[in-house]
Amino acid sequence: EWFKTRGISKDTLDELKVSVGKEYMPQTGKSENTIQFNYYVGGQLTNIKYRDARKNFKLYKGAEKVFYNIDNIVGHDTCVIVEGEMDVLALHEAGISNAISVPNGATLNSNNLDYLDNCIDYFDDMSKIIIAVDSDAPGQALQTELIRRLGAETCYITTFDDCKDANEYLVKYSSKELLSRITNAKPVPLENVTTFRDIEDEVTDFVRNGFKKGFQIGLDNFDNIFSTYTKQFITVTGIPSSGKSDFVDQMVV
C-alpha cells in the first residue's frame, strides 16, 4: 500500500525483485518490518538494502558496493544515474529500465565513490550517461564528481524543478512527464567549447542582417565594402607611391 502512494506498481516491484520481510535494524535495536532492495551482479544476489518505516537503512557490511540495478544497463549505450532505489523504481514506471542508483545516497564533501570504481567497466561503451540526482547540495556535489570521473563529453544532466527527486516528480506530475524530463536532459557544457545553440541568436542575426558595420572613414565607395573595429590589426599594401600613407592618414583622422 505504501508503494502505491509513491506511484509504484506491483509489476515494477516484481520486475526489480523488491521484497519485504523482518530484519534486525541496529538503529532501533530490534527486528523490524522492512522493504528489501536486492542488489544483483551478473544475476547473483550480492547485497540487500533494508529500509524500515522510520527510514532507517542497512546494507550488509563487507559486501562489495555496486550500483543498484546494474545488470539492467548491460547491452545499452545509454543509462540514467539516480540517487536512490525509489528513483530507479519511478523511472521504471516511466518506461526507463536502464536506470541505476548509487547504493548509499550522496554525502557532502565526500568523493569516495567506491561503487563506481567497482562498476567502471559497465560504462566503457556508454555514449550517453544521464545524471538525474537530487537537487540539494549533496546531490549536486555527487553530480559534479560523477561528471569528473565519467567525462563531461558523455554526461547529460536534468533537474526536477520544484521536486527533490525522480520519485517525487512522478507522484506530483506523471510518468509521462517524468519520461520527458529524462529524455530532454541537456549535455554538460564543455569548457572552451562553443556549440551552435550557444550562439544561435548571433547566427540568426547574421543570416538576416549580415555583418554589422564598424568604424567608417567617410569614403562612400570604400565604406560600402569595408569597416574597422577596435583591436583589429590591418595591413595596408600596394605598389610604391600608390597613396598608402595618405590612405592610412585618412583612416586615422
Residue ranges and their predicted role:
Residues 1-35, 72-81, 128, 141-201:
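Short, small/acidic-rich helices and loops at N termini and domain boundaries
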Residues 133-135, 238:
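Short glycine-centered, acidic/aromatic-flanked micro-motifs in structured strand/loop junctions
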Residues 23-125, 143:
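Phosphate-handling DNA/RNA-contact segment within nucleic-acid enzymes
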Residues 191-253:
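The Walker A/P-loop phosphate-binding site
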